[in-house]
């Protein structure tokens, strides 16, 4: 009996199955290899993982806030402020360094008492006075606000953005008792009497050095703003309630 044909058939079948098995194994291996490539092709492995800790420690990153002046813009603001002082001097004299510092502190006091609303540009009846030793200067609030805005047109409400950039300095000077809130703006914004000296309308309450009193005053003002004109009732809230406050009106 000739079995060569059968052997050829069976042999061919075995070869086919073996080839199929090989292809399956190759596919599995390819999938495994690709998965390994994908799993290791992440940001850390490709970039940071190839940098030593020593090199990483040398990297310095600074990202500007979108709602506050950058360090360069703060410098531009100060230069414009000095020019404002010179332009308002009857003899156009350059102000002394001491008077410039007094002016800066005076601006801090102004934004605490009057706030940083763009409407200050229309406050022609309001003035602020600075003095150092025998030097005294008085300026109209509207003149100052409009002058600064005209010099820094790319920064909406530049006085507010400047105050936000200088918030830590303002808080330090306030803590030292050099400047204090008169409480009028805070009261108008619904802040309780015990928190009024901690309130600033330009603060957003995100800083690590933000005190509980500052945060509470800010949230009280937000509560007042949410309910203003909506018939909201007058209520007292504790800090935890305010932190969880959604639109109540």
UniProtKB/Swiss-Prot annotation:
It comes from the Viruses. It is found in: Virion. Capsid protein self-assembles to form filamentous capsids, about 650-850 nm in length. It comes from Lettuce infectious yellows virus (isolate United States/92). This is Capsid protein. Belongs to the closteroviridae capsid protein family. Transmembrane segments: none annotated. Residues 1-33 are annotated as: Disordered. The lineage of its organism: Viruses, Riboviria, Orthornavirae, Kitrinoviricota, Alsuviricetes. Disulfide bonds: none annotated.
